[in-house]
Amino acid sequence: MLRTTPHYIDPRTNRPLTDPNYVMECAIESVRNKIDDYDSVLVITQIQPFIDRFVQEFGSKCIFTDRQRLKTDADWKGGRSDAHYKMTDKEYELEYQNVLLDVLLASKTDHILGSTSNMFMGALIMNPNITFGSIEKLSDFGGA
């Protein structure tokens, strides 16, 4: 489960990170360290460049839902990073459906790598027996 870059705190500066490539590479390194123990990696993110980078690295081992994602490292359409955009009721409904699908799918996996988020916690609550860990080098974070 991979969030937008500003959710992660740079331990050197104690400020939010600004480099999405650093976030992607940290996540990929964490998955690379675990992938031999698993058949595949379920990539849960709303950010298309993150999906693209995972597919580039892990190829057919990547699993993800087929849906439209954000083209940039944005929090969510109409959210903090795009406050001038007003979502329609249909867009909100689709967003909620996608969130619930992601949480349900994550709760069915054998292991979750992620960071603090309501979705991460929801998946762990749905399956209290699942093993989990933080994305290495991204264990300092802000927001829920």
Locations of regions flagged by a protein language model:
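Residue-level detector of alpha-helix boundaries and kinks
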Residues: 39, 90-94, 108-109
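Core catalytic architecture of nucleotide-activated donor-dependent transferases building glycoconjugates
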Residues: 1-78, 97
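Generic structural signal for short, solvent-exposed loop/turn connectors between secondary structure elements
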Residues: 34-39, 116, 141-144
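N-terminal, helix-rich and Lys/Arg-enriched segments in bacterial and organellar proteins
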Residues: 39, 83-84, 123
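General secondary-structure edge motif
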Residues: 34, 85-86, 103-104
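Surface-exposed acidic, glycine/proline-enriched linker/cap segments
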Residues: 79-98
